[in-house]
Amino acid sequence: MSTKSMIRDVELAEEVLSKKAGGPQGSRSCWCLSLFSFLLVAGATTLFCLLHFGVIGPQREEQSPAGPSFNRPLVQTLRSSSQASSNKPVAHVVANISAPGQLRWGDSYANALKANGVELKDNQLVVPTDGLYLIYSQVLFRGHGCPSTPLFLTHTISRIAVSYQTKVNILSAIKSPCHRETPEGAEAKPWYEPIYQGGVFQLEKGDRLSAEINQPEYLDYAESGQVYFGIIAL
């Protein structure tokens, strides 16, 4: 039934009842009926507007034609993304704690991995396919006190490309944990100096990547996960 039909029926009912009602009692009844009719019409009109403009009614799921629905569970989305990229080359190697005095990378430790063609040869990661890669590495230095000569710590990631076979630094950082010498007789306080580097690069199949430092004797192996090197295909 439309809103106009409802209003017309209410008006007809008012005319019939107003003819039958008489005197003060009839006027009072007519007034109550008019108020009730007004509220009924107002309510019906409001309900019609809400239904017409879709303010109330069944909920419709918003979906994007080029992507997952907005109410899709996050876990399911992450799982699908992980499955879609499971065939991409990836590697995460950690420092070999059994090789003191030098930075040697290993892939047989906990939390280390190599997958989908990445190889570790001669302390270098070998790229299996052309593409964009995220390259990252972190080292942590530790020492006690500061020497009389300046102490500089460097961390460098280099690339040897198959196309020109020349070692080129693609990421490099330098830090100095000591700003002045520890006075003679003073307590040698410990210091820590982390260096993290990362960037995205276009690599070719067969490229070799290395992560090196200049002061391996200051490396801190006290905790696992402090010194690592890795690549992820994007």
From Swiss-Prot:
Lipidation (N6-myristoyl lysine): 19-20
Compartment(s) of residence: Cell membrane
Transmembrane segments: 36-56
Record-marked site positions (Cleavage): 34-35, 39-40, 49-52, 78-79
One term under GO cellular component: plasma membrane
SMART domains: TNF (SM00207)
Topology Extracellular: residue spans: 57-233
Domain THD: 89-234
Disulfide feature: 146-178
Keyword Electron transport: no
Glycosites: 81, 96
PROSITE patterns: THD_1, THD_2
Molecular-function annotations in GO: cytokine activity; tumor necrosis factor receptor binding
CDD domains found in the cross-reference section: TNF
Record keywords, A-Z: Cell membrane, Cytokine, Disulfide bond, Glycoprotein, Lipoprotein, Membrane, Myristate, Phosphoprotein, Secreted, Signal-anchor, Transmembrane, Transmembrane helix
Bilayer topology term: Single-pass type II membrane protein
Cytoplasmic side: 1-35
Gene3D superfamilies for this protein: 2.60.120.40
InterPro entries for the chain: TNF (IPR006053), TNF_alpha (IPR002959), TNF_CS (IPR021184), TNF_dom (IPR006052), Tumour_necrosis_fac-like_dom (IPR008983)
Residue(s) carrying Phosphoserine: 2
Stated family: Belongs to the tumor necrosis factor family.
Subunit-structure text: Homotrimer. Interacts with SPPL2B.
Function: Cytokine that binds to TNFRSF1A/TNFR1 and TNFRSF1B/TNFBR. It is mainly secreted by macrophages and can induce cell death of certain tumor cell lines. It is potent pyrogen causing fever by direct action or by stimulation of interleukin-1 secretion and is implicated in the induction of cachexia, Under certain conditions it can stimulate cell proliferation and induce cell differentiation. Induces insulin resistance in adipocytes via inhibition of insulin-induced IRS1 tyrosine phosphorylation and insulin-induced glucose uptake.
Name of protein: Tumor necrosis factor
Gene this protein is translated from: TNF
